[in-house]
Amino acid sequence: MAPASSRRMAWLLAVALQCTAFTQAIPARAASALVAWAFTEEGVLKLRTSRNARLEAFFQAASDGRGTRVWIDIPGELRFPRRLEGRGAVREIRLGKPRAGATRLVVEFRPDVDLNPNDLRLRGTAPDRWELVFTGLPTRGLDDFGEGD
């Protein structure tokens, strides 16, 4: 019969192996690649992400009394969804989780703001920096605001 310390070591090893197998079966939820964002008084949305993040941008024209919406999907999961009141032509900015493993930043404009989707381009300025210039956006009343640095 094995001494008590050997049995205890075997038991601890078995528990450790089971815990490892269990944690590998659970899908990992990576933190959002979005590190910081800012909407400038010039009508530019600036994003800072983890290096080489792949972003997708979308446009939805105004309808049913709601303003035009532009949103960007970013890899990784946001911890705390939130809404921020906009300024000037921006009605609101929302950060949320559209699905597991993704973060969405939505810029909703006031209903009277008219934007042409052909004038909008999300471009990378560095491996971890992005800009979306809202050409034609009225800048009166816009102030710099955002989160992070």
Predicted features along the sequence, with ranges:
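Accessible peptide chain termini
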Residues: 1-2, 149
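Bacterial N-terminal signal peptides that target proteins for export
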Residues: 2-12
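Bacterial N-terminal signal peptides
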Residues: 10-21
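Signal-peptide-cleaved, periplasmic/extracellular N-terminal interaction regions immediately downstream
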Residues: 22-149
